[in-house]
Amino acid sequence: MQRDIMRYLNPSLRDIAAYSVEGGQQAAIKLNQNESPFDLPMWLKDAIVSEFVREPWNRYPDILPYRGTKAYADFLGVPAEGVMMGNGSNELLYTIFLACLGPGRKILVPDPSFSLYEKLALLLQASLVRVPLKASLDFDVDAIIQSAQEESVDFVVLSSPNNPTGKSITFDDIRRIASSCDALVLVDEAYIEFSRQDSALPLIEEFPNLVVLRTMSKALALAGMRIGFAIGRPELIAEIAKPKIPFASSRLAEITLMHVLENYAIVTDAVSYILNARDELYGELLSVQGVEPFMSDTNFLVIRVPDADAVFRKLIGRGILVRNVSGYHLMKNCLRFNIGLPDENSRLLDALLAINGGMA
């Protein structure tokens, strides 16, 4: 018997595509997911595993991971009651969106921005207010404030630094938005360690409607561990945490986080390398004919080329995997790639020079 299974499901699923990574996740030079090029050193992994094997594997972890939460709160110098740890910042986005949105409620998102924001808004049947970026891919702060006020939005989500553009909002402009909008304001700081702008964290003391999101997947090189944090006023975090999945963070994730925070020089050294390599590669790309690089506040660069699809395919043919972000608003013929190891950056640059010269 034939049945239309969609009639059993949330009708919003018709408007949502499954998440996918064009080109896959395997390549000789993998630069498409904004990962750190550095894995943890083996001596640190050994210390983490040595502690983890002494944990009881037959017992559930804590409902909320208090050890990891306290470790990160102490690292930031904020009260642990104002910090929520999750299984990656994406899990926390699900949690926060569930807490804030539903049918009839409005969310404002700059466009383009991280694709998960729109997906979650559609899934929760909220009304989406898109505010286009400027042609330079910078945020249009005045338009954000005006739209938030005119549309009476309930929720404003700002990716700063922004994925996929690499641009940041200034500290003062975030203050303007938080003070001008009668809405919860979420600042997703996944790439803040690479930014020229200051974090919005100090504004939490000033604005009870502000939440800052952090991930350990980028600067801390823990993408495989799935660790993220939301930081806000304790009374706000207590409410936002209500729809959170219990037991979502593993003991291994907590132990790993604590060891990395105790050895944070590893992170600062990696960030220093990435910043220097980013600026060096940006400067070299300026001299490549037919390639327009954009300044970045992240661990990745965006370039515009005459034909992004063709360049993307030719790079794959050379074993180099980047991200084709041409489908985003204002980003026609744009490619995105994270900073890799020195040899990877050199091979990418050489490939772009060769492709631009007409070589296959």
Curated annotation (Swiss-Prot):
SUPFAM superfamilies: PLP-dependent transferases. Its cofactor is pyridoxal 5'-phosphate. It catalyses: L-histidinol phosphate + 2-oxoglutarate = 3-(imidazol-4-yl)-2-oxopropyl phosphate + L-glutamate. It holds the Pfam family Aminotran_1_2. Keywords: Amino-acid biosynthesis, Aminotransferase, Histidine biosynthesis, Pyridoxal phosphate, Transferase. GO terms for molecular function: histidinol-phosphate transaminase activity; pyridoxal phosphate binding. CDD domains: AAT_like. Its EC number is 2.6.1.9. GO terms for biological process: L-histidine biosynthetic process. The modification N6-(pyridoxal phosphate)lysine is found at K218. InterPro entries: Aminotrans_II_pyridoxalP_BS, Aminotransferase_I/II_large, HisP_aminotrans, PyrdxlP-dep_Trfase, PyrdxlP-dep_Trfase_major, PyrdxlP-dep_Trfase_small. Pathway: Amino-acid biosynthesis; L-histidine biosynthesis; L-histidine from 5-phospho-alpha-D-ribose 1-diphosphate: step 7/9. Belongs to the class-II pyridoxal-phosphate-dependent aminotransferase family. Histidinol-phosphate aminotransferase subfamily. Homodimer. This is Histidinol-phosphate aminotransferase. It comes from Chlorobium phaeovibrioides (strain DSM 265 / 1930) (Prosthecochloris vibrioformis (strain DSM 265)).
